[in-house]
Amino acid sequence: MAKKSMKNRELKRQLTVAKFAKKRAELKATIVNLNASPEERFAAVVALQKQPRDASAARLRNRCRLTGRPHGVYRKFGLGRNMLRQAAMRGDVPGLVKASW
């Protein structure tokens, strides 16, 4: 199990990303817009750099919903490999069966 502080930190990052998403998209659009003046583009770059680091979606980490494990997480289920295996063995995941050949 991940520490509570790590889970809370990730939740805080998700909220920060959601809060700044619209403004970041506008600034990025201004930066790549070739019709904008160089001064406007530079101002957009500076404004983007002044935003918090955690406002970037690249800083988010997929974590298991049950344990908070950061590695071995299946996106489709939102579970870590261990929890997914346990859920599959209990029959909690419809259509998922253990392979045998």
UniProtKB/Swiss-Prot annotation:
Entry's Gene Ontology BP terms: translation
Sequence intervals crossing the membrane: none
Pfam families: Ribosomal_S14
Disulfide bonds: none
InterPro entries, per database record: Ribosomal_uS14, Ribosomal_uS14_bac/plastid
One Gene Ontology CC term in the entry: small ribosomal subunit
Entry annotated with the keyword Ribonucleoprotein: yes
Superkingdom, natural source: Bacteria
Function: Binds 16S rRNA, required for the assembly of 30S particles and may also be responsible for determining the conformation of the 16S rRNA at the A site.
PANTHER family: 30S RIBOSOMAL PROTEIN S14, SMALL RIBOSOMAL SUBUNIT PROTEIN US14M
Family according to the record: Belongs to the universal ribosomal protein uS14 family.
Complex and partners: Part of the 30S ribosomal subunit. Contacts proteins S3 and S10.
Protein name: Small ribosomal subunit protein uS14
Lineage: Bacteria, Pseudomonadati, Pseudomonadota, Gammaproteobacteria, Pseudomonadales
Gene name for this UniProt entry: rpsN
